[in-house]
Amino acid sequence: MKQLNSEQLQNIIGGNRWTNAYSAALGCAVPGVKYGKKLGGVWGAVIGGVGGAAVCGLAGYVRKG
């Protein structure tokens, strides 16, 4: 089995702690619901909340640093 060296480990994207993704998702879901409700009623709120959580949750997962 081949082992990774430290330079190869720097190229891995993602893998941050789950709390980073979770807090980022919650931080974007709330404004997504708020603005989505204004634009599209109940379904706008659902789409805005889920979309905001997905985008920011992914960003929190893959963010380096």
UniProtKB/Swiss-Prot annotation:
GO cellular component: a single term: membrane
Subcellular location: Secreted; Host cell membrane
GO terms of biological process kind: defense response to bacterium; killing of cells of another organism
Propeptide residue span(s): 1-15
Major localisation: secreted
Keywords from the UniProt entry: Antibiotic, Antimicrobial, Bacteriocin, Host cell membrane, Host membrane, Membrane, Secreted, Transmembrane, Transmembrane helix
Transmembrane segments: 39-59
Entry keyword annotation includes Zinc-finger: no
Membrane topology listed for this record: Single-pass membrane protein
One Pfam family recorded for the sequence: Bacteriocin_IIc
Xref: InterPro entries: Bacteriocin_IIb_lactacin-rel, Bacteriocin_signal_seq
Subunit structure: Active lactobin is composed of two different peptides, one which is lactobin A.
Entry's family note: Belongs to the bacteriocin class IIB family.
UniProt function note: This heat stable bacteriocin inhibits the growth of closely related Lactobacillus species. It may act as a pore-forming protein, creating a channel in the cell membrane. It kills Lactobacillus helveticus ATCC 15009, but displays no activity towards Listeria species.
Listed name of the protein: Bacteriocin amylovorin-L
